[in-house]
């Protein structure tokens, strides 16, 4: 006979004030929103990490930028992102661009969507909270990122070189080793270039 042991689990995350909520008449949509808010709490511990279900838990910049609007709806992320964007700026340069992960433990740099975090997250914080300070503080990094793209464009003005994640992990492509979707990765890169 085995004894039942009492186990205690402590949830840890950055203390970020709840600011938004969503409810509707559909139980499944409400459950989805609940899952989103819990995932945010589980993944926001000093840096925005990517996956609670794996042991990777890195500060992937693509995940952070694509989730930034939702994160700002759910919680007051202004100070959280302000601190993390300092980390992003410290790891970035005109020569290398912006890392895919911050803190940069992979030494991988400069692809659309991921590196666009340098522009998108400060813009989200400004749009949601009216904080011009985050734009001023990150202006150099923002400009250097856009200049990096411009410097890597061809004569036609399009960004068609270097590594790109493309539509990462999309399921609309025949089996391949590169894990990108069927959408042309440079089309996605140029769409983001226009956006930033």
Describe these PLM feature segments.
Residues 84, 121-122:
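Hydrophobic alpha-helical segments typical of transmembrane helices
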Residues 11-35, 41-42, 48-100, 109, ...:
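Active-site acid/base region of carbohydrate-active enzymes
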Residues 1-10:
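Single conserved hydrophobic/aromatic residue that forms the stacking wall/gate
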């Amino acid at each position: 006979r085995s004894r039942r042991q009492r186990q205690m689990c402590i949830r840890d995350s950055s203390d970020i004030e709840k600011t938004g909520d969503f409810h509707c008449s559909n139980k499944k949509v409400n459950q989805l929103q609940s899952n989103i808010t819990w995932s945010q709490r589980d993944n926001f511990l000093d840096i925005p990490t990517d996956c609670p279900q794996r042991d990777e838990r890195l500060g992937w910049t693509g995940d952070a930028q694509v989730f930034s609007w939702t994160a700002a709806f759910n919680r007051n992320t202004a100070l959280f992102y302000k601190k993390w964007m300092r980390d992003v700026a410290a790891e970035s340069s005109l020569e290398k661009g912006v890392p895919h992960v911050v803190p940069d433990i992979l030494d991988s740099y400069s692809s659309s969507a991921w590196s666009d975090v340098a522009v998108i997250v400060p813009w989200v914080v400004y749009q949601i909270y009216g904080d011009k300070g985050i734009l001023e503080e990150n202006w150099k990094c923002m400009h250097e990122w856009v200049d990096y793209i411009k410097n890597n464009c061809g004569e036609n003005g399009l960004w068609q070189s270097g590594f790109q994640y493309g539509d990462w992990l999309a399921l609309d492509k025949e089996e391949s080793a590169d894990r990108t979707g069927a959408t042309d990765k440079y089309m996605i890169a140029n769409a983001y270039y226009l956006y930033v």
